[in-house]
Amino acid sequence: MNSKQIDVMVADASHEIYVDKILNTIKEAAKVRGTGIAERTHEYLATKIKEGKAIIALDGDEFAGFTYIESWGNKTYVATSGLIVHPKYRGLGLSKRIKAASFRLARLRWPKAKLFSLTSGGAVMKMNTELGYVPVTFNELTDDEAFWKGCEACTNHEILVSKDRKFCICTAMLYDPAKHADDTI
């Protein structure tokens, strides 16, 4: 199978039918990896999809991958979150296509916002680095309490709290558009 045969697009209301499959894929990946992935509700992901704040990958009508975008601090910070590829489609470079699409979407919708990503996975760190993200400490991220509340759904939340929100199992990575003025979207 070739990743190019899989359609990667901005999700819309017609893709809401995939939410349960997305949630199950994320849950299973968290079990296999043994690391924290913050759980989200059906309603939360459905809203992201309906608002056009998500990227979905489909092989015909079959779910292949997903990610969504969240904005914080009055849209001064934007996170690309929940990147997942169904096991059947792993190893094809699909996650890189999904990540690049979410990066473009975030840059188009919020061109001056700082983009950040939290990850414990080497592959995502590599993709982020290729896009221009750099590792930062957590205190360089948004101070928006709604963002930090979302971390409560992660199995590693106690570590984050015990370190006064400065460190966690995840690596925080930041893309500052002010430092990439010559980059095109």
Please name every model-derived segment.
Residues L23-P87:
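A conserved beta-strand-loop-helix scaffold within acyl/acetyltransferase catalytic domains
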Residues M1-S3, R107-I185:
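Terminal substrate-recognition subdomain of acyl/acetyltransferases
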Residues V85, G91-A106:
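Conserved acetyl-CoA-binding loop-helix of GNAT-fold acetyltransferases
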Residues N2-I22:
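A short beta-loop-alpha structural element at the N-terminal edge
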Residues E16-K27, K31-A38, D164-H180:
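Amide-forming acyltransferase catalytic core, primarily the GNAT-like/NAT-type
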